[in-house]
Amino acid sequence: MSSSSESHLATAKTALTAVASVAAAAILARSVVQDYMPNEVHEYISHGFRRFFSYFSYQMTAVIEEFGGFEHNQVFEAAEAYLSTKISNSTRRIKVNKLEKQSNYSVTVERDEEVVDIFDGVKLSWILVCRHVDKKDFRNPRDLNSTLKSEVRSYELSFRKKFKNMVLESYLPFVVEQAASIKQKFKTLKIFTVDSYSVEWTSVTLDHPSTFRTLALDPEVKKNLVEDLDRFVQRKGFYGRVGKAWKRGYLLYGPPGTGKSSLIAAIANHLNFDIYDLDLTSLNNNAELRRLLMSTANRSILVVEDIDCSIELKDRSTDQENNDPLHKTVTLSGLLNFVDGLWSSCGNERIIVFTTNYREKLDPALLRPGRMDMHIHMSYCTPAAFKVLASNYLEIQDHILFEQIEEFIREIEVTPAEVAEQLMRSDSVDKVLQGLVEFLKAKKQIDNSKA
């Protein structure tokens, strides 16, 4: 081997030895810092280094957290939807999800994956960052980033500093607008309920077949309701002009089996709104109620079924706060503050539905004008409702027994659910309708014997 080759080899060995020594020293220093330096000091030094080097960087990073106080961060949700359309071949990891009743695959960015977007010739880099925090460290009751999750998620959007105004004034509004179209196009309806352990919303896919076409409801009531719903979603400017929160309230009342739940599903399908089914008996106090209500999304329906049984709806004049720390209750005033109080303006395009079997049991405070905008009586089955049921279940528009059946329906109280049950008893139309006649005749005899 020549002296020149030996010299190069010796130089390489020296360089490798130096690199190995530096690496070993770095590992040792890192171990010492982690083991012996307090976390506060470590964070302070790291923060100082980051601030020092940031002065020499042309880059700026916008941190977009999942929650902004009590509410979902609109920009975070928009970024999640928008970036699903920007995943390229260079992306290494993606998250794919499809529930049984979903028609489309949901594709989102996995944590620590970079997604590059170009807007007006400007390069913008997105990264999803997930930070795990112990539950015991959650101490901020005003921030859902800290109160509900053990994993805090945020997007980091990086760009050149000189494009800051463009990002804030043009790019992010563009992302929000595009995301709204994407979500509406691929939206799968969901129904949310409260997890009793964590006191947060959990959801499943809503695949309820009820529509206004199939609903056994008085035609005039149905027509008025559909017109009211369509008018509501088109009047954002109107609500802002008159100074009212963009919400609508409906009270559905009537005996069990008259289709209150089916009507709620029909409203959700008609408007493409998610449903939040709130069981007030599962909550301990007004603070939990407020936190849940503030975390509901826009374009949604809040449902409180059997409102007369859910909480002790006493008059607000006697609805005093209880200072006993063991006292657990959701009060009428706490609920009404969200329905039409100051908290009602936190959120847009929301529908509130209360149901009850006995309207007369409700506190007058719930029934006053302007609180529930429409009171919809879910009555016993009518001849018109029967014809809708016959069309849905038997696929017929007329039959020789219709006149007799309709006469019975006018004379007795029978719910649409009872009629529907009879219509499912056979595949033979004649046999089913004859069975319905016998059922109605027997029911009339029972009613007469009680008179």
Curated annotation (Swiss-Prot):
Induction: Induced in roots by salt stress. GO terms for biological process: response to salt stress. The keyword Cell cycle does not apply. It holds the Pfam family AAA. Its EC number is 3.6.1.-. Keywords: ATP-binding, Hydrolase, Magnesium, Nucleotide-binding, Signal. Disulfide bonds: none annotated. InterPro entries: AAA+_ATPase (IPR003593), AAA_N_dom (IPR025753), ATPase_AAA_core (IPR003959), ATPase_AAA_CS (IPR003960), Mitochondrial_chaperone_BCS1 (IPR050747), P-loop_NTPase (IPR027417). It catalyses: ATP + H2O = ADP + phosphate + H(+). GO terms for molecular function: ATP binding; ATP hydrolysis activity. Residues 1-25 form the signal peptide. The keyword Hydrolase applies. Its cofactor is Mg(2+). ATP binds at G254, P255, P256, G257, T258, G259, K260, S261. This is AAA-ATPase At3g50940. It comes from Arabidopsis thaliana. The lineage of its organism: Eukaryota, Viridiplantae, Streptophyta, Embryophyta, Tracheophyta.
